[in-house]
């Protein structure tokens, strides 16, 4: 039993004295245990007593064959849906946390692939398709270079170069006026071209067989395209610039330069 002695505060005008007989018994302050509904004492009131030691399970050998592992549980938190959703609110609605293993709506679940066991085979490349050549281009690759072109501009170029004597060292090419003069002197293809005035070098084409003569000239040159009299006539008009052949004012009629004619043909 402890007794609290009276204490007096020092001071000139104030003094306080505890009433006598005020004693506190520590045993009376021991909490009272109320029985619970089952008749036993409530364990929460036995705070002065030491808690019982937990029972320790006996040690068992670990067997990896029988051990089963379970996935870790995802902790779900509750957040408020108010102005500040980052603050915790015990009154908020519990929203399930998204799981990385469960697929979302509309997503397909694909089985896991083992990339380490895959082997890369040889890459198959499709062969580059070779360009398809037309019949004309195929002939162009296999045929030798043409000596004479069928354009009138080339005829004029050849005529000018021959007139200046620039064919030295180069292979001589058959020109149109040489081809026509040879036919007339030999008398070949008389149904296509003939002499009108042999001494003056005037000759005329047949209106009926002029295309046949033009095709013969194209074959002589080795052209791939079909030669026509229209192309041949353009080449003849270009000779007027160099003087080998000029046009006469008659239908389908032309005249050689006198320098090209043999001496027996001069008047």
UniProtKB/Swiss-Prot annotation:
PROSITE patterns: ETS_DOMAIN_1, ETS_DOMAIN_2, ETS_DOMAIN_3. GO terms for biological process: immature B cell differentiation; macrophage differentiation; regulation of DNA-templated transcription. Residues 174-257 bind DNA. InterPro entries: Ets_dom, ETS_fam, WH-like_DNA-bd_sf, WH_DNA-bd_sf. Pfam families: Ets. Its main location: nucleus. Residues 41-62 are annotated as: TAD2. Belongs to the ETS family. Sequence specific transcriptional activator which binds to the PU-box, a purine-rich DNA sequence (5'-GAGGAA-3') that can act as a lymphoid-specific enhancer. Promotes development of plasmacytoid dendritic cells (pDCs), also known as type 2 DC precursors (pre-DC2) or natural interferon (IFN)-producing cells. These cells have the capacity to produce large amounts of interferon and block viral replication. Required for B-cell receptor (BCR) signaling, which is necessary for normal B-cell development and antigenic stimulation. Residues 1-31 are annotated as: TAD1 (Acidic). This is Transcription factor Spi-B. Keywords: Activator, DNA-binding, Nucleus, Transcription, Transcription regulation. Gene3D superfamilies: Winged helix-like DNA-binding domain superfamily/Winged helix DNA-binding domain (1.10.10.10). Can form homotypic interactions. Interacts with IRF4/Pip. Interacts with JUN. Interacts with TBP. May also interact with CREBBP and EP300. Interacts with NONO/p54(nrb). The protein contains a weakly acidic N-terminal transactivation domain (TAD) followed by a second TAD rich in proline, serine and threonine. Each of these domains may be required for transcriptional activation of a subset of target genes.
